[in-house]
Amino acid sequence: MAVSSLAGLGLRREMLAEFSQSVPAQIDFFEVAPENWMALGGKYGKQFRALTERHAFFCHGLSLSIGSSAPLDIDFIKGIKAFLDLHGIAVYSEHLSYCSGSGHLYDLMPMPFTPEAVRHIAGRVKQVEDIIERPLILENISFYAAPGAQMTELEFVLAVLEEADCQLLLDVNNIYVNSINHNYDAAAYLAAMPTERIRYLHVAGHYVEAPDLIVDTHGADIVDPVWQLLCDCYALHGPLPTLLERDFNIPPIGELLQEIDRIRDYQAAAIRTSRRAG
C-alpha cells in the first residue's frame, strides 16, 4: 500500500480573501475548475496567482466534453494548457461525460455505455494529452439514466481506463450515489477499481430526494455511509490524496476543516493498519 496521504479542498472565489492571509496547515492542496479562473484578473487574479505560487494545485475541468460527438475545441484545450503552465499545475482531470453539442454546456451528461463510446473517448484522450503535455485524468460521474447501455457502468469505466491507458479520479460519493440510484453493490465497485490507475479521490455531500434517489450536489456535509466507503477505499487502495468538494451552501472554513481533519484521521489510520500488516 502506497503512503501518499494528502488532503485538499476545492477553492471557491469567496474563500480567496481568507486564504490570502493564511492557509491552514491541514490543507495540502487546492483544486480549481480552470474555466472559472482562466480569465480572472484584477484583485482576485492577483490573489489567486499568489496562492498558486505558494501552494500545490490540481485542476478539475467542467467543459472539455471528452465524450461529445462534436470535434474537440482545440483553442479551448490550448487555453487550458496555458493556464496549467502559467500556474505550474501538473494534475488535470475531467469528467467521463459530455456536456456539449454545438456549444459548451455545464450539465454533465452520461455517456452511452457501449464499446463504440469506449473507443471514441480513448482516441480523444490521446488528442488532449498531446496538446496539454500531461496525463488526462478521468472521473467516474453520477448518472441518473443509461439509455442504450450495452455494458454496466463499471465495465464501461474499466474499459475506458484500459483502452485510453489513462488515470482515474475516483469519486467516492458518486459511487455511493449511483449504488443507491441503480441498486448496485458499492463495495464491489470499489474493489474492482485498478489501484495503479487511481490518481486521487473526491469526496462530497449529496441531497436525498427519496429513499431510492440521491442527487450529487456537493452542497451538504458528508454522510456516514460515504465516510465508511472512503475508509474502505483506503483499506483497498491506500490513503490516496483526497479532495473535499463543497460547491453550494458553503459553511465557514472552520467547518470544512473539520471534514478535512476527518479525512486526514482516516488516512493516518490506514497507514497505521498497513504498517502493522506489513
From Swiss-Prot:
Belongs to the UPF0276 family. It holds the Pfam family MbnB_TglH_ChrH. The lineage of its organism: Bacteria, Pseudomonadati, Pseudomonadota, Gammaproteobacteria, Alteromonadales. This is UPF0276 protein Sama_1305. InterPro entries: MbnB/TglH/ChrH, Xyl_isomerase-like_sf. It comes from Shewanella amazonensis (strain ATCC BAA-1098 / SB2B). It comes from the Bacteria.
